[in-house]
UniProtKB/Swiss-Prot annotation:
Keyword list, A-Z: Cytoplasm, Elongation factor, Protein biosynthesis
Name of this chain's protein: Elongation factor Ts
PROSITE patterns cross-referenced by the UniProt entry: EF_TS_1, EF_TS_2
Any one Gene Ontology molecular-function term assigned to this protein's record: translation elongation factor activity
Location(s) in or outside the cell: Cytoplasm
One Gene Ontology term, aspect cellular component: cytoplasm
Source organism (scientific name): Saccharophagus degradans (strain 2-40 / ATCC 43961 / DSM 17024)
Length: 290
């Protein structure tokens, strides 16, 4: 049957899908828009499944902290391309995810990704045409202290910090420092032994160590390991907004100590497959024939 342009327009407005996809759905249902929507919803699950094997290494992070600093949550939601990561619909989905995490104090993705979140995700995959996934979620509760957060302007780096005391603004300043400098641990004593041992091996292999007496090598080793620990321990680092004081001193002057921090950066740890243009076109042609 012939489908009117107004009906196609209505379906597009209600689903956000493309004109040809909407027209096809209406033709298949003889113009029944409700059945067309139902069929499209069913199809979205299949479409989402087909895209699930594609690497989603772009995206954004989001963070939300209680006004009193009693707790905060942070999430990472991935897309395949940076272009989609700036899409209004994608960003609205991220807001839904972080608000759900905040309201429920979610501690893992499985607990967060209920029917509502999953159905919204699948509908977005259907509309945008990319694999989209909620990768991780982090909850930090302040206890008797305070939690602060920082989200970088590009939405690709976010940090939650926990202090024993102080206020949300101090915790936020320290979170901003963590975002900028990326320390490995809070205190040097927290550095994993295997990391220290690996650094020692690197130092021993440096040319200026060759041929020196053992006692000299040992002294140089101690000095360089201490330097490495200071450079990578949050409380020993010069505060990014005032290098005259360390982060530890900044917190101490406010009657606080840094308990911990968590830093999310979009795509860290994900191996992104790089394809050349010819390979990408070939893959798309093969997919269209499947």
């Amino acid at each position: 049957m012939a489908v009117s342009a107004s009906l196609v327009k209505e379906l597009r407005e209600r689903t956000g899908l493309g004109m040809m996809e909407c027209k096809k759905a209406l033709v298949e249902t003889d113009g029944d828009i409700d059945v067309a929507i139902e069929n499209l919803r069913k199809a979205s699950g299949l479409k989402a499944a087909k895209k699930a094997d594609r690497t989603a290494a772009e995206g954004v992070v989001a963070v939300k902290v209680a006004e009193d600093g009693s707790y905060g949550v942070m999430v990472e939601v991935n897309s395949e391309t940076d272009f989609v990561a700036r899409d209004a619909g994608f960003l609205a989905f991220v807001d839904t995810v972080v608000n759900k995490a905040f309201d429920t104090k979610a501690t893992d993705v499985a607990a967060l990704a209920g029917d509502e979140i999953e159905s919204t995700r699948q509908a977005l995959v259907q509309k945008i045409g990319e694999n989209i996934g909620v990768r991780r979620v982090q909850l930090i509760e302040a206890g008797s202290g305070v939690v602060g957060a920082y989200l970088h302007s590009n939405n690709r780096i976010a940090v939650l910090t926990q202090l024993t005391a102080g206020d949300v603004e101090l915790a936020r300043d320290i979170a901003m420092h963590v975002a900028a400098v990326n320390p490995q641990v809070v205190n040097s004593a927290d550095m994993p032994a295997e990391v220290v041992e690996k650094e020692k091996e690197i130092i021993k292999a440096q040319p200026d160590m060759e041929g020196k007496p053992a006692e000299i090598v040992d002294k140089m080793m101690v000095g360089r390991i201490n330097k490495f620990l200071k450079e990578n321990s949050l409380v020993d680092q010069p505060f990014v907004k005032n290098p005259e004081v360390t982060v530890g001193k900044l917190a101490k002057d406010a009657g606080a100590e840094v308990v911990g921090f968590v830093r999310f950066e979009v795509g860290e740890g994900i191996e992104k497959v790089e394809e050349d243009f010819a390979a990408e076109v070939a893959a798309q042609v093969a997919a269209s024939k499947a």
